[in-house]
Amino acid sequence: MVVIRLARGGAKKRPFYQIVVTDSRNARDGRFIERIGFFNPTAQGQAEKLRLDADRFAHWVSQGAQPSERVASLAAQAKKAATAA
């Protein structure tokens, strides 16, 4: 099954997540099909916290990809921010 989930990067105690489309059998930080955004939970000040390519997200969901709970909430947050801006 194709899923949309977070792949962890960054340093110890300083997480940085890529939002990736991957096969559910692949490792969390392993091989992926496409990178569609990022999430930086430790962003401060003017640093960008979340970027998500909404068109690609919608495309993959229409193809049957299942977003994780966290990615679904981040997508809703990104959509809300896009309509406010």
From Swiss-Prot:
Transmembrane segments: none annotated. GO terms for molecular function: structural constituent of ribosome. One of its GO terms (cellular component) is cytoplasm. SUPFAM superfamilies: Ribosomal protein S16. Signal peptide: none annotated. Keywords: Ribonucleoprotein, Ribosomal protein. One of its GO terms (biological process) is translation. The keyword Ribonucleoprotein applies. InterPro entries: Ribosomal_bS16, Ribosomal_bS16_CS, Ribosomal_bS16_dom_sf. Belongs to the bacterial ribosomal protein bS16 family. HAMAP family: Ribosomal_bS16 (MF_00385). This is Small ribosomal subunit protein bS16. It comes from Acinetobacter baylyi (strain ATCC 33305 / BD413 / ADP1). The gene is rpsP.
